[in-house]
Swiss-Prot record:
<keyword id="KW-0482">Metalloprotease</keyword>
<keyword id="KW-0812">Transmembrane</keyword>
<keyword id="KW-1133">Transmembrane helix</keyword>
<keyword id="KW-0378">Hydrolase</keyword>
<comment type="similarity">
    <text>Belongs to the peptidase M48B family.</text>
</comment>
<keyword id="KW-0472">Membrane</keyword>
<keyword id="KW-0479">Metal-binding</keyword>
<dbReference type="InterPro" id="IPR050083">
    <property type="entry name" value="HtpX_protease"/>
</dbReference>
<protein>
    <recommendedName>
        <fullName>Protease HtpX homolog</fullName>
        <ecNumber>3.4.24.-</ecNumber>
    </recommendedName>
</protein>
<dbReference type="GO" id="GO:0006508">
    <property type="term" value="P:proteolysis"/>
</dbReference>
<keyword id="KW-0645">Protease</keyword>
<dbReference type="Pfam" id="PF01435">
    <property type="entry name" value="Peptidase_M48"/>
</dbReference>
<feature type="binding site">
    <location>
        <position position="228"/>
    </location>
    <ligand>
        <name>Zn(2+)</name>
    </ligand>
</feature>
<dbReference type="GO" id="GO:0046872">
    <property type="term" value="F:metal ion binding"/>
</dbReference>
<feature type="transmembrane region" description="Helical">
    <location>
        <begin position="46"/>
        <end position="66"/>
    </location>
</feature>
<dbReference type="InterPro" id="IPR001915">
    <property type="entry name" value="Peptidase_M48"/>
</dbReference>
<keyword id="KW-1003">Cell membrane</keyword>
Amino acid sequence: MKGLAELKNKIVKAPHLNIFKIGTWVTMGLFATFLLVYIFVGDEMLNYYPLLILFAFGTPFISLMISKATVKRAYNIRMIGDGGASTEKEKLVVDTVTLLSQKLDLQKFPEIGVYPSNDINAFATGASKNSAMVAVSQGLLNSMNETEIIGVLAHEMSHVVNGDMLTSSILEGFVSAFGVIATLPFLMGENNNRGRRAASSMATYYMVRNVANIFGKIVSSAYSRRREYGADKLAAEITDPSYMKSALLRLQEISEGRISLQNSDREFASFKITNNFSMGNIFGNLFASHPSLAKRIAAIERMEKTTKK
């Protein structure tokens, strides 16, 4: 196993999640949220707004806490860690995730699984970097070689060590809270009025809600794309840029139809190494959870040129 043998000899500087920085942003965000509540609604609804905002923040974190159990059922994932690997490529997956976990100083190694799908993809999920799970599709194992598989796994492990699942949930909480702040005054106006004023207030509520949803989707998608670039970069650093580039080129072949896909699933697309449903136009790219493969490959090629200097 040339690829894995090279990885064993590579010195890796493990990144560390800056909890203080995350806590600072959360505190500032909460302060800004309640300030907006006071500006827009005054004292009238402050009594129950905190509870509603807490619910808006709490929902993404509850989803994060149960994410492993949810995806295990949704994807019919077969766990292959602790001697469960039955093929050479499954053993490669286990060995690679184990080795990367050691090099990245994880206190607890991720659970490792394979799911039955022709979709050539992989994803990471879990409430924290020490309670994570990495899963790959059978289609990926059937279609990629050793270095490509290592590149994909390094990308997913980068999500784990960067705490991307947690930061994504924090962002979703802020987006949900923004939706509550933006729409609830209009909904309360509908309840407090009658006739034409009520109809007008309800129409305004739906309009503002849709605008808030679109804005939230744009913000979360922009962060997701930035997160993917970061995972690509770290994956290239802890393995080799050629590994990540090779994996992305293979995915590009798939996206261009040179390799057929079946049974693709939109659910959990934002957690995967690529999103097969991204649109090519400017409007579509605004809502894409992943950058285009061409842009990701170009970013890796720039890294290659830098490292060769």
